[in-house]
């Protein structure tokens, strides 16, 4: 069996890529919500036509990415500010009908008991 592939990334580039920024986080989050609400409004306006179905499918796919956002916000890795991470996490949890405090601690428990049968809540 061959050893797993490990990408060689320049340490300076890696440091630059993982830096947190409130401005970049707000920009990316803002674009996400702008597109989400724009496609949502468009799908609502197309209700009753055949165009509703493909547009709503696009909306559902975009909405599904809120799960990835919730995961990264759980790790406080989107914004530099903890307050912005927490606020955005609450917003995303509200959108997906999840309780934010339970969600955060459940995910933390997952990382402390990863793949332990009966103890990993996400396993």
What label would you give each PLM region?
Residues 1-52:
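Topogenic membrane-insertion module of multi-pass membrane proteins
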Residues 3-5, 55-56, 70-72:
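Short acidic/polar alpha-helix capping motifs at helix-coil junctions
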Residues 22-23, 60-62:
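Short hydrophobic "helix-edge" motifs at membrane interfaces and signal-peptide entry regions
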Residues 31, 59, 96:
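Aromatic-acidic/polar surface patches that form glycan- and anion
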Residues 50-61:
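Loop-to-helix transition at the N-terminal end of transmembrane alpha-helices
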Residues 63-70, 74-123:
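Membrane-embedded catalytic scaffold of the fatty acid hydroxylase/desaturase
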